[in-house]
């Protein structure tokens, strides 16, 4: 299932016939039809009992509220993008949670990105902790990681994963709510078989 036309793709590399993700994407695999796991996982959404999932979520959130007492119910990693706004809306307005918003700043925020983050905090009245590594450190890490693993923002990915967990542990916050689906992101998991 090597795509016959170039379309800006590198010849000899396998691509998903639906979304064009290359085989070089970490964790990706393809079925016999040439469709990646992430695309197959996306199909699973049509067959999920969403009412049962809602009940599971409600139980998890209620348990977190009970454990938190008067403290924060959950840690909410946010960047200020559309996903952050949606997560904050659902947690605060739909479920009535009191999240602590956290941001690992890669130190490359655009003016618009910074504004959006501040707006999200204001709209949902969120307390917020942000960690911003020194610009010199960020630049060193970017240079080293682009050479070592081909990703100049490796420190971003690591920080976005580690910082919220550190905050949840430090402040004994019982729940961490992420805003992306690993089932659709890179195919290492599915909706039926999570990581």
Show which residues each predicted segment covers.
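ATP-dependent adenylation/nucleotidyltransferase module used to activate substrates
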Residues: 4-195
